[in-house]
Regions:
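Short strand-turn segments of transmembrane beta-barrel domains in outer membranes
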Residues: 192-193, 198-226, 235-249, 292
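Outer-membrane beta-barrel signature, preferentially recognizing the C-terminal barrel domain
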Residues: 287-311, 347-349, 439, 459, ...
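Extracytoplasmic beta-strand/coil segments of soluble accessory domains associated
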Residues: 110, 114-150, 154
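Structural signature of Gram-negative outer-membrane beta-barrels, strongest in the C-terminal barrel
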Residues: 322, 364, 397-519, 565-566, ...
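Gram-negative outer-membrane beta-barrel transporters
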Residues: 420-425, 516-518, 539-622, 675
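N-terminal periplasmic "start-of-domain" segments of outer-membrane beta-barrel proteins
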Residues: 71-102, 132, 140
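Short acidic/polar hinge/loop motifs at secondary-structure boundaries
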Residues: 132, 151-178, 196-199
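Flexible loop and strand-edge segments within Gram-negative outer membrane beta-barrel domains
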Residues: 242-253, 268-318, 322-351
Length: 680
């Protein structure tokens, strides 16, 4: 039976922020920042005095140098609506630093996330084409994805959430927060959140990169970084194409991204804009019955935010933000066949909104309050309510018209207070959420996070949070020969508990965590009877996810500077599900297919002079008929101040495996490339 499922497993993740009140971007969204394996890199898009803008000897360099010199107690994090330092924060977030990204054998953000034990990445195509990402046993629709604090998740479907307009070279760090976080990020943070933080250098430079390899794959990237006074700007673009590693998996990807920042005594500003485009053969991505599917997606986004500080001591900070993103999707059930009868659909989703966050420090702690209003508007040939003919909208490039419309407004009100006494932190907050797609009433989602730090090495923490997710337009309106949505679906609800501890000392750090998530009215695509031929979107009842994870890193370059191995990093996660329902469920497509076990191992070592190697091993076992598999990747790299040359191989054992349904993944994929960076 064809299974196209998606799930994530438990793992300790950590969000991290930068020093100084400098990351309004995160403060604005009340992001959760945390420090975990290896990074004290700051969390900001591009702040004039943020760590990401400082010279090589600063925080980023410290990721690969001496951690002991990092003043963790000075680093502000956003595990709460009011920014707290890393030591004060009651949250732990997993941070994938720029140094980690540069060493990894990775072609996309999705490849990087595969190395986080608690993240489940189910890939359909190479280079991150059509990827489902989930956390802690949830599904791909249950996480919030942010770019510099801007929520870029899609109300249409989570399948296209990973269409990022940035390349790996644009990224300062990736932060992963696991567990329900509605009171910080809003109702869409049902099982976790991922924030991608970009960078802009403090110097003028131009970077050009190119690569090529297996399956006719080639591509290139270029960027320009400008720093003038208090203004920092970066513009980048890239193109990649490939014949794909399996039948009908060819693709072409284009992207462009711009980010900037400006800083003054009382006001800091950050802004960004981006575009991504993908055209790809969709093989059997959505149905095993059709092997010649095709899809093309386009994404446009923009945001701007300010950090207003009436007093220089940051006793009160106001952070407004406005944002917009458009997602355009063209799908053909059979490549080249046009028309609704042939299974061709068009969708255009516009999401826009604004937020305002304020936080104040006073005698009894730190208090934060905020509001976010988000409007989602979809035009489609398949999703939404049928419109009168005089309201149909022409579709560019075809004689068809959008004849359906869906729209809803999501309003979130936030309130939080933080108490810090010695090594003890208590952070309690409340989200009041109203969505016009429901009954128009405000619903309350509280949360409490507690941590205790007996000394600089140890930290223990516990949390309890609630969240809700409304169905996507795909869940509600899909209707074709193999799938049927349901406009009567109820929203999902989640109550999550998490406990854990972190230990960090010179040359070593580890995080151990456990979680229990109680889900009700969980949405999945299932066969309602054993004889069913069509998957149906249903509320499948109660689904409890429980598990634990451990993530540890040994930084041998700090303990044994002359030893050829510089770092060893290992992680393991286990998850168990308990499902109960009043009716029968057969053939789960997503929610009941989860990673029971996942283990990761990374080893970095020197070879000769500037020549280094990075190895990554991943073993995982998925439930419901999937065979366990082991995958090994390697990257050889020669690094110099102005250039970088590398050869990387994905799946060096040439093992054929399946992440999702019967979508076969490629064997060994070898790429070689180089980049040059010139200052001016």
């Amino acid at each position: 039976m064809f299974k196209n499922n998606f799930n994530a497993r438990p793992v300790a993740l950590h969000f991290k922020h930068f020093t100084h009140r400098s990351y309004a971007l995160f403060s604005c969204l009340g992001r959760e920042v945390l420090i975990c394996t290896l990074s004290v890199a700051t969390l900001t898009n591009a702040k004039a005095d943020g760590i990401s803008t400082k010279p090589v000897a600063s925080a980023l360099a410290l990721d690969s140098l001496s951690r002991e010199e990092v003043k963790l107690d000075e680093v502000l994090v956003t595990g709460s609506r009011a920014p707290l330092t890393a030591l004060q924060s009651a949250k732990i977030v997993a941070v994938i630093s720029r140094d980690d990204i540069q060493r990894a054998e990775a072609a996309s953000v999705n490849d990087i996330l595969k190395l986080v034990p608690g993240v489940d990445v189910r890939q359909r195509g190479g280079f991150g084409v059509q990827t489902d990402i989930s956390i802690n046993g949830g599904t791909f629709d249950q996480i919030t994805i942010l770019l510099n604090g801007m929520n870029i998740s899609s109300a249409q479907t989570g399948h296209n959430a990973a269409d990022f307009p940035v390349s790996l070279s644009d990224i300062e760090r990736i932060e992963v927060l696991e567990g329900a976080s509605a009171r910080v990020f809003g109702s869409s943070a049902f099982s976790g959140a991922i924030n991608i933080v970009t960078r802009a250098d403090a110097e003028n430079n131009v970077t050009v990169a190119a690569e090529g390899g297996s399956f006719g794959t080639f591509g290139g990237d270029a960027s320009v970084n400008l720093a003038t006074g208090a203004v920092r700007q970066k513009l980048s673009g890239g193109y990649t194409q490939s014949d794909g590693g399996t039948e009908n998996s060819d693709f072409r990807r284009r992207r462009a991204y711009y980010t900037g920042s400006w800083k003054s005594r009382y006001v800091d500003m950050q802004w960004q804009g981006g575009f991504s485009s993908q055209d790809f053969g969709a093989s059997t991505f959505y149905s095993a019955k059709f092997k010649n599917q095709f899809e093309a997606t386009r994404r446009f986004l923009a945001s701007a935010q300010a950090e207003i500080k009436p007093w220089t001591d940051d006793r009160f900070v106001l952070t407004p933000m406005v944002y917009w993103h458009k997602d355009v999707d063209h799908y053909q059930l059979i490549k080249g066949k046009e028309g609704a009868a042939a299974g061709e659909n068009y969708h255009r989703l516009d999401t826009y909104g604004g937020s305002l966050n304020a936080h104040a420090s006073w005698l009894l702690g730190k208090t934060a309050a905020g509001v976010d209003v988000r409007r989602e508007h979809i035009l489609s040939t398949a999703y939404g309510d049928v419109q009168p003919e005089d309201k149909w909208v022409a579709i560019s490039g075809t004689d068809r018209k959008y004849n359906r419309l869906g729209e809803r407004t999501n309003t979130s009100l936030f309130l939080e207070h933080n108490v810090i006494v010695g090594g003890f932190t208590l952070s309690a907050g409340l989200l009041a959420n109203r969505n016009t797609a429901l009954d128009g009433k405000f619903r309350l989602y509280p949360g409490v996070d507690v941590s205790y730090r007996p000394n600089d090495e140890w930290k223990v923490y516990a949390s309890w949070n609630r969240a809700l997710r409304v169905p996507t337009y795909t869940d509600l309106y899909t209707s074709n020969s193999v799938q049927q949505g349901d406009i009567a679906l109820r929203p999902e609800k989640n109550e999550a508990f998490k406990v854990g501890t972190r230990y960090r000392t010179h040359g070593f750090e580890a995080v151990l965590s456990g979680f229990y998530s109680k889900g009700t009215d969980i949405i999945d695509w299932v066969y309602p009877t054993a004889e069913s031929k069509k998957y149906q979107a249903m509320n499948i009842g109660k689904l409890d996810n429980m598990g634990y994870s451990v993530d540890a890193a040994l930084h041998l370059q700090e303990l044994l500077p002359k030893f050829f191995i510089t770092r060893i990093k290992a992680g393991y996660a286990f998850i168990h599900q308990k499902h109960s329902t009043d009716g029968d469920v057969f053939g789960s497509l997503y929610a009941l297919e989860y990673l029971r076990h996942k283990a990761t191992l990374q080893v970095d070592h020197r070879i000769w002079r500037q020549l280094t190697a990075s190895w990554a091993l991943r073993w995982q076992e998925r439930m419901n008929g999937y065979h366990p598999y082991t995958k090994v990747d390697v990257r050889l790299q020669w690094s110099a101040p102005t250039y970088n040359i590398y050869v990387k191989a994905d799946n060096i054992t040439n093992h054929h495996y399946y992440d999702l349904g019967n979508v076969k993944q490629p064997g060994i994929w070898v790429m070689a490339g180089a980049s040059v960076k010139l200052k001016f």
